[in-house]
Structure formats: structure tokens, C-alpha cells
Amino acid sequence: TFAGQASTLVNRMLVSGLAEGSLAALNYATRLMGLVPGVVGTSIITVMYPTLSRLAARDGWSRYSKAFSESIKMISFVLVPTAVGIAVLRVPIVRIVFERGAFDTEATKATAWALLFLSPAVALFTLRDMTNRAFYALQDTTSPMVVSIISAGINIVLNLILVGPLAQGGLALANTLSSAFGA
């Protein structure tokens, strides 16, 4: 969406004013964080979306609501502990995955700093995507779009506030907090 692209543009402009390597650290942390929702989250959503669509079309609100609630519980049960684990083990994770050659200890620290603030997004991004699919199952495409625009606005404001005190970690935290609104 345009709002998402504007948010990304502001993010890139702000990170370009930070220390050398900040953009790379943020990108590497984002890649690591995106693996779990990309694999686990997508699997859950792929299974639940057809069920939600069928229930929304035929079986009424009660069963649809229960199925949606169960999918949120399942996502939370799997991904909240995963997010905590990533936050706690962020330095060894980054070291094992990336630290070699030009990616030195300082790059590990910078990436782990961003990953700390992105780790809750492991669950939040999947919850957001599940919620969007729940709206789509109801034939409602407007609500996710409105939420996306508001989330992008929140992200831009938080980027401006948090980049100073937290550097690339602030940009990561802004992304996480704005995704919490969308979840």
C-alpha cells in the first residue's frame, strides 16, 4: 500500500543518518525475525483461512468466531514463546547465522540490538496476518486497509520519536509497536 511504502521510505531516510552498518543490521534482524512467521505463521494461516471462509459463508457467526479465537490461541501458543526465545538468545542466533568474514562482533551486536526490539513481531505479524484473513473471510477488505494506513502513520511517528534514543533498535521497536496496533 501507499501508506506502507511511505513508512518504509521514512524508515530508510532515518536509518541513513545513523552509524555505518545500521541499515544492514536492521535488514539482517528483519530477515531473521521474518523466518518464523514466514514458515510457522503461514502454515497456520493457510490451514485456518479456508475454514474461516467456509464458516463465514455458511455456518454463522458463532462457529466463525470460535474458529478465529482458536487460531489466535494457536498462534499465540506457538509464537509467543518463540519470540521470547529469540529475544533471549538473539546474540548467539545472530552470531551463528551471520558472524563470519566482514560480519564481525560489532555487526553482531548491532543486529542483535535490532532483533531484540523485533522479536515480539514474530507473533504480532502472524496475528496481524490472521486478523486480515479473518476480515477477508467476511468479505471485508476495507477494515484491513484502514488499519494498515493507521499502522503506517503510527510507525512513522514512532520512528521519529524512537530513532534518536535507540538508533536502529528504535526503528525496529516502532515497527513492532505499529504492528501491535494492526494485530
Language-model-detected regions and their locations in the chain:
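Membrane-embedded alpha-helical bundles of multi-pass transporters/translocases
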Residues: 1-183
